[in-house]
């Protein structure tokens, strides 16, 4: 089987607030909240690139949909890596996220593996790493 990960869905506590954070604060393009005509169907999609969609979905609805018990999020269970083309871009995105309300957990700095990165948590505690890796080419 060839893996085809297409959608990463984040369970959020307040869909409207998270939409504002990602759309207005981080500048991610979206059509906004869709699916409101369905019971517990409201969702937000962001096209991250040709192969990946970031989705925001109410956490209680995600728990119900997946038939798992409601539990508090653990930020150390997962981090989402956003790879950029330069150290300056890392710094700019980290600053943009902090202005939008993110909590910087580890400011951008040189890393032991030769790159440069920083971490922040979004409004629901989801952990993001913004990273530049000199060994990886970033295609625009």
Per-region residue spans from a language model:
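Short, charged, solvent-exposed linker or helix-capping segments at domain edges/interfaces
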Residues: 57, 66-68, 140
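N-terminal beta-strand motif that seeds the catalytic metal site of vicinal oxygen chelate
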Residues: 1-19, 37-39, 77-82, 134-140
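Vicinal oxygen chelate
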Residues: 4-14, 44-48, 67-140
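Acetyl-CoA-dependent GNAT
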Residues: 57-64, 133-135
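Alpha-helical elements of the RecA-like P-loop NTPase motor core of helicases
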Residues: 19-20, 64, 91, 106, ...
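Core segments of cupin and vicinal oxygen chelate
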Residues: 9-61
């Amino acid at each position: 089987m060839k893996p085809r990960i297409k959608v990463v869905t984040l369970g959020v506590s307040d869909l409207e607030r998270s939409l504002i954070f990602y759309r207005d604060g981080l500048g991610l393009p979206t059509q906004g909240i869709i699916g409101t005509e369905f019971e517990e169907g409201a969702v937000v999609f962001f096209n991250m690139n040709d192969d990946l969609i970031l989705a925001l979905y109410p956490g209680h609805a995600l728990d119900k949909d997946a038939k798992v018990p409601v539990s508090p999020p653990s930020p150390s269970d997962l981090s989402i890596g956003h790879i950029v083309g330069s150290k300056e871009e890392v710094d700019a995105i980290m600053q943009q996220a902090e202005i939008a309300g993110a909590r910087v957990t580890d400011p951008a700095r040189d890393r032991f593996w030769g790159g440069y990165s920083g971490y922040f948590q979004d409004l629901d505690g989801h952990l993001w790493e913004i990273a530049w890796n000199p060994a990886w080419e970033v295609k625009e």
